Amino acid sequence: MEIEVGDFVRTKQGKIAKLIEVSKNNYYWFDNWIYKESGIPHQGFRIEDTERIGIVKHSKNIIDLIEVGDYVNGERILDITGDYIHTNETDHNRFYLAKHIKTILTKEQYKANCYTVERKE
């Protein structure tokens, strides 16, 4: 897996980060803490740890990492077509390009942080 500075990555836990530096001793440094679940105690890791980290996708284009069910700018993604992502959360269709993306909440993060209220029927 060839990840370059400026590439975005997505882990199997749903974390998204951008590679900001590859140090002289071949440590990969990201702008977000994506290693916590893998037991790596710092923000940098060697390329041989990529599988342990659980990186499942990488791309220079952030839109390539977004999946149906994720939330972009607070709206649930219903479809992805080429460079467009489609939502329909406010009774009208909305399409986003990569340049319009401000925030991403992956479906994995949503599920991990969601509290379900159980009701007795």
Could you say what each language-model-derived stretch is?
Residues M1-E121:
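Structural boundary micro-motifs
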